[in-house]
A protein has these predicted regions:
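Flexible "cap/lid" loop of the alpha/beta hydrolase fold
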Residues: 108-109, 115-147
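Hydrolases whose catalytic domains are alpha/beta-hydrolase-1, hotdog thioesterase
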Residues: 102-106
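Conserved alpha/beta-hydrolase catalytic His-Asp/Glu region
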Residues: 149-202, 207
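Active-site loop/oxyanion-hole signature of alpha/beta-hydrolase fold enzymes
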Residues: 43-46, 55-98, 263-266
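Conserved HGGG/HGGXW glycine-rich cap/lid loop of the alpha/beta-hydrolase fold
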Residues: 12-67
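Conserved serine/cysteine hydrolase catalytic core
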Residues: 183-236, 245
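N-terminal cap/lid segment of alpha/beta-hydrolase-fold proteins
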Residues: 1-13
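Catalytic histidine-centered segment of alpha/beta-hydrolase-like enzymes
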Residues: 246-258, 262
């Protein structure tokens, strides 16, 4: 990821790639998943180049962001620090998984700063504990065992099976550059020095109806079954939400199928044709 700014926050310097374009629209702010980093958005950043302002960042513990001291921190406060440092009063948030959770929490805390939300298989603060099917539970147990034994390469491979391929799909369903990039991004996260305790935002699950619009929801039909179901529950609760269930992809459509994902962003009016 090309770094344009290092944004200092308590205990860290956040790596930011901001590419401004004077088109009068709120910048796109792309928030990565918890098994990736800002490079998840390579395709979207390329599509926005020269057409719309766009920003991506590596959160603490990911990518090129520098950890100076393990410090309790809040993701919402870190994002706010980035937007304030770059004098961005209002933005269009696009968040995947944990990045979707951050987008939701930020929008509820700072609704006046948000022009719209695009949530890609989002985690949600305060959501009910999921019930995992046997296949997902077996993978989760194997990941826990690999972590306990310090077998980080095995853990990385298993997490690719869970999040990139889809738990019900064969290992290696996604290969080539997408697989290599997943393993590189998640490998950094698995080996990152401790960033300090994460201070959770207030529960968002009971307040989804209060999200500022417009809200768009995207998910891959090959994702973990309980996450697909959660997306459908979210869709039923948010007034006026627009939905894009994507066939043939799992949890990370921007990585697995960037052209198809960018087509969704164009249909949503976030990218120009």
């Amino acid at each position: 990821m090309q770094i344009s700014h290092w944004i200092p926050v308590d205990g860290a310097e956040l790596a930011v790639d901001y590419r401004p374009h004077d088109d009068g629209r709120a910048p796109l702010v792309l928030l990565h998943a918890g098994v990736t980093d800002g490079r998840l958005w390579d395709g979207a950043m390329a599509a926005a180049a020269g057409r719309r302002s766009a920003l991506r960042m590596d959160r603490r513990g990911f990518g090129q962001t520098r950890i100076e001291a393990a410090t309790p921190h809040a993701m919402v406060a870190d994002l706010l620090a980035v937007l304030d440092a770059l004098a961005l009063p209002r933005v269009e948030l696009v968040g995947c998984s944990q990045g979707g959770r951050l987008a939701i929490d930020f929008a509820l805390a700072q609704p006046g700063r948000v022009a719209g939300l695009t949530l890609v298989a989002p985690a949600v603060t305060g959501a009910p504990e999921p019930v995992l099917n046997a296949q997902v539970q077996a993978l989760a147990d194997a990941i826990d065992a690999a972590e306990a034994a310090g077998r980080l390469d095995d853990m990385n491979r298993l997490e690719a099976r869970l999040w990139l391929y889809g738990p019900a799909r064969p290992e290696g369903r996604v290969g080539g550059a997408a697989r290599e990039l997943f393993l590189a991004m998640n490998g950094i996260a698995l080996r990152s020095p401790p960033a300090g305790g994460l201070v959770d935002a207030p529960p968002a699950w009971p307040r989804l109806e209060a999200l500022p619009g417009p809200v768009r929801l995207v998910w891959g039909e090959l994702d973990l079954p309980h996450l697909v179901e959660r997306c459908r529950q979210i869709a039923a609760r948010i007034p006026g939400v627009r939905c894009w269930p994507m066939q043939g992809v799992a949890h990370l459509p921007a990585l697995e199928a960037p052209a198809a994902f960018n087509a969704v962003l164009r249909e949503a009016g976030l990218l120009d044709g």
